[in-house]
Amino acid sequence: MRSRAPLALMEQTVMVLIFALAAALCLRAFALADGISRRVESTDRAVLWAESAADTLKARNGDLSRAAAELGGEVDGQRWTILLDENWQETAGEPAYTLTARPVQTGRPLLGKAQIDVVQKNGERLFSLEVCWQEAKT
């Protein structure tokens, strides 16, 4: 009579391999979900910063200097730039994210417009929006 031990050992080996495969698939799914979560969080933060910049520009009638004085950042000619670190705090060092607002010509009297972009340090645009406001008559 033959022993059933090799058959049981083979069955256990197959079960361990199936378990290892399932564990590897689960780890890959969790890693993918973590990456997606980080991208979505960055996009959410970019939207918040862009909307804050847009609201500040509208409240200041498109005056980049006054908007920068209120929200932060620097104005360089016709561009307002805010440098942000990986925690979305303003930084003077190497930025992880950059918010840029620049005026855009509308071709219409009494209508001001600006383009606001938030980009990662690798150049990938996270969020972009245009903001318009009514300029005061002079």
Q: Where are the predicted features?
A:
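N-terminal leader/signal peptides at the extreme start of proteins
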Residues: 1-7
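Short hydrophobic/aromatic segments of transmembrane alpha-helices and their interfaces
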Residues: 2, 12, 28-29
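Flexible, low-complexity segments enriched in proline/glycine/serine and punctuated by aromatic residues
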Residues: 7, 14-18, 30-138
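Alpha-helical transmembrane segments
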Residues: 20, 24-27
